[in-house]
Curated annotation (Swiss-Prot):
Residue ranges of coiled coil: none
Gene3D superfamilies: Porin
Induction: Unlike E.coli or S.typhimurium both OmpC and OmpF porins are expressed constitutively, i.e. at both high and low osmolarity, under control of OmpR (at protein level).
Stored InterPro entries: Gram-neg_bact_OMP, Porin_dom_sf, Porin_gammaproteobac, Porin_Gram-ve, Porin_Gram-ve_CS
GO molecular-function terms, A-Z: porin activity
Keyword annotations: Cell outer membrane, Ion transport, Membrane, Porin, Signal, Transmembrane, Transmembrane beta strand, Transport
Signal peptide stretch: 1-21
Membrane topology according to the record: Multi-pass membrane protein
Protein name: Outer membrane porin C
The organism of origin for this protein: Salmonella typhi
Biological processes, Gene Ontology terms: monoatomic ion transmembrane transport
Compartmental location: Cell outer membrane
Originating gene: ompC
Assembly notes: Homotrimer. Forms mixed heterotrimers with OmpF and with PhoE; other mixed heterotrimers with other porins are also probable.
Any Gene Ontology CC annotation: cell outer membrane
Length: 378
């Protein structure tokens, strides 16, 4: 019986962190769920910047209220607290915080810190035990979590076509000190006004296909030609993404390809020790593919390949790195689920990047990393 229960629970746990939430309140059309996890995590690597304790915890809530038979209000908040720092470091941040209204089959609208519509497709490959999703990041235009998202979502195309979902999104300018870190918003985390949309279709028999397009204005800091360390220049940051997914019969296969213009970043621009070079590739080709299998007794092995190839990486002073790999690795890992609340995993990132002038100047790690984690979630 335990084996059968695990085979049903594990796929649900992989959908979202809140899938395993604890119901706190459910009465008179009002519902509140609490969710969270503690990840006792350690990295082993020759890279001193990666090696060591990486323990963290996340906690959040999801709530909804039934206004009437056609209108529902909802909200969600999620927070991350690092457990590998001293008590006075205050190293924590808000991952998401938004509120919205759902109008029956007419769709939903929400505003706040949320996920960009590009992630509607790229999330399909962001399922590795620890690593993954490296070809983009938080506060990276409209590619993942960010501030000031106004999002309209429609499920099953107004209730007329099962599995056909679409979203339209606008993001306001973020150039001030905010975002998902305690160091403020560096130019690599800034964005101008942006908009985009996504379309996904669950074809049936476990197959899904999707695509997304976003375009954002770039800020003055991001186009500051007087900064010799800054690479990449352009009025807009544009992303085109397509993906495929198969999720059935204990098999999970997914792939996504993105082509970006002035949007794929590298290096570090904030803090007291920025990298020698940082900025955005004028063009980048990003590819992620993953394969997993869920055994009935709780084991889920995983293998993946990720690559981000930057094209024409140059600055306003005539310096150029040409075409360079920003991310390139094979990932082999496995997760074992003791039950719906407890799991452990190992994830081996086999780095395929070579040390060269670009990786050294941008501070990009070229060493392998092995991650070991023990997770309690609710």
């Amino acid at each position: 019986m335990k084996v059968k229960v695990l085979s049903l629970l594990v796929p649900a746990l992989l959908v979202a962190g809140a899938a395993n939430a604890a119901e706190i309140y459910n009465k008179d059309g009002n519902k509140l769920d609490l969710f969270g996890k503690v990840d006792g995590l350690h990295y082993f690597s020759d890279d001193k910047g990666s090696d060591g304790d990486q323990t963290y915890m996340r906690i959040g809530f999801k709530g909804e209220t039934q206004v009437n038979d056609q209108l529902t209000g909802y909200g969600q908040w999620e927070y991350q607290i690092q457990g590998n720092q001293t008590e006075g470091s205050n190293d924590s941040w808000t991952r998401v915080a938004f509120a919205g209204l759902k109008f029956a089959d007419a769709g939903s609208f929400d505003y706040g810190r949320n996920y960009g519509v590009t992630y509607d497709v790229t999330s399909w490959t962001d399922v590795l035990p620890e690593f993954g999703g490296d070809t983009y990041g938080a506060d990276n235009f409209m590619q993942q979590r960010g501030n000031g998202y106004a999002t309209y979502r429609n499920t099953d195309f107004f209730g007329l076509v099962d599995g056909l979902d679409f979203a339209l999104q606008y993001q306001g300018k973020n150039g001030s000190v905010s975002g998902e870190n305690t160091n403020g918003r560096s130019l690599l985390n800034q964005n101008g006004d942006g908009y985009g949309g996504s379309l996904t279709y669950a074809i049936g028999e476990g197959f899904s296909v999707g695509g997304a397009i976003t375009t954002s204005k770039r800020t003055a800091d991001q186009n500051n030609t007087a900064n010799a360390r800054l690479y990449g220049n352009g009025d807009r940051a544009t992303v085109y993404t397509g993906g495929l997914k198969y999720d059935a019969n204990n098999i999970y296969l997914a792939a996504q390809y993105s082509q970006t213009y002035n949007a794929t970043r590298f290096g570090t621009s904030n803090g007291s020790n920025p990298s020698t070079s940082y900025g955005f590739a004028n063009k980048a080709q990003n590819f992620e593919v993953v394969a997993q299998y869920q055994f009935d007794f709780g084991l889920r092995p995983s293998v993946a390949y990720l690559q981000s190839k930057g094209k024409d990486i140059s600055n306003g002073y005539g310096a150029s790195y040409g075409d360079q790999d920003i991310v390139k690795y094979v990932d082999v890992g496995a997760t074992y689920y003791f039950n719906k609340n407890m799991s452990t995993y190992v994830d081996y990132k086999i780095n395929l990047l070579d040390k060269n002038d670009f990786t050294r100047d941008a501070g990009i790690n070229t060493d392998d990393i092995v991650a070991l984690g023990l997770v309690y979630q609710f």
